């Protein structure tokens, strides 16, 4: 980017751990609404998993020195659905680990919930955080099974992380989605230049985000509190991190949250969602 001059990259990424959290049995947690395209949940999980794997392969091609670890945390999928997930991973010949999570292991750590789906959601998220605590990767990307990625998404996120954190001289949080709720109030934001597009600072996030192991450890209490019980909003303690740290999201979106068309947490603006959806169809 010639007009911007040279940015000296002092924060180089050596390794990335991707923790993909899936539950193929619940259509939309905490809602009765239908997702865009109104397909069974397994279809979203498969296409979103496919998109993430394609993005991993592109990253390995363009950034061969960056080590990538891929883990799937599965929350009680049926044998049939779990086989579909495994078959897709095997088709891509990508190294991975699938962890079959049993939510009963957290019955002493999470407050009892009237809704078992809520308990399961908290438990699988806590499992992701527990896995991350043991991980030694430079960056950790927590990603849910209803985020549809572009092939170039991970490369852009990693390059932007290096650029912005080098300029900021500190760690940052990178969210892949341009959520509608970012535009629903008069909140001021800063516009930044990433590797390929503009980004904006944010004060709210959901449970799909990229964070350094260093920052994750720094705010470990917030991550633990997030899963102790159902908060309002759900991400209350994640958002508290953004009160003292810089978080950014892309303009335009690098991953689409495949929710209901009217959800403020969902479909990003100015994206050909149908095209991206079809590009990630699983070919039998």
Language-model features and meaning:
Residues 16, 55-71:
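Short loop->beta transition adjacent to catalytic acidic/histidine clusters or analogous donor-positioning motifs
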Residues 64-77, 100-103:
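Short beta-strand/loop segment that forms part of the nucleotide-sugar
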Residues 27-43, 110-117, 223-228:
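Short, flexible/disordered intra-domain loops and linkers
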Residues 111, 121, 132, 139-141, ...:
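Conserved catalytic core of nucleotide-sugar-dependent glycosyltransferases
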Residues 1-54:
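N-proximal low-complexity "stem/linker" segments adjacent to membrane-targeting elements
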């Amino acid at each position: 980017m010639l007009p911007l001059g040279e940015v000296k990259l002092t924060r180089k990424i050596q390794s990335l751990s991707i923790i993909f959290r899936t539950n193929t049995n619940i259509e939309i947690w905490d809602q009765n609404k239908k997702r865009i395209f109104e397909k069974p949940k397994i279809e979203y999980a498969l296409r979103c998993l496919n998109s993430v794997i394609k993005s991993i392969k592109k990253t390995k091609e363009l950034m061969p020195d960056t080590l990538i670890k891929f883990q799937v945390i599965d929350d009680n999928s049926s044998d049939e659905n779990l086989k579909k997930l495994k078959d897709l991973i095997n088709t891509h010949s990508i190294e991975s680990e699938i962890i079959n999570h049993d939510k009963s292991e957290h019955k002493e750590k999470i407050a009892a919930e009237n809704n078992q789906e809520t308990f399961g959601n908290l438990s699988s998220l806590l499992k992701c955080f527990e896995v991350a605590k043991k991980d030694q990767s430079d960056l950790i990307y927590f990603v849910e099974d209803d985020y549809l990625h572009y092939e170039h998404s991970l490369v852009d996120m990693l390059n932007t992380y290096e650029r912005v954190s080098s300029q900021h001289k500190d760690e940052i949080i990178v969210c892949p989605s341009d959520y509608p709720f970012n535009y629903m109030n008069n909140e001021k934001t800063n516009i930044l230049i990433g590797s390929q597009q503009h980004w904006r600072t944010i004060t709210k996030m959901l449970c799909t985000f990229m964070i350094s192991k260093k920052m994750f450890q720094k705010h470990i209490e917030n991550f633990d509190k997030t899963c102790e019980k159902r908060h309002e909003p759900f991400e209350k303690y994640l958002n508290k991190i953004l009160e003292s740290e810089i978080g950014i999201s892309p303009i335009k979106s690098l991953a689409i949250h495949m929710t209901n068309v009217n959800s403020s947490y969902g479909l990003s603006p100015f994206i050909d969602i149908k095209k991206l959806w079809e590009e990630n169809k699983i070919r039998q």
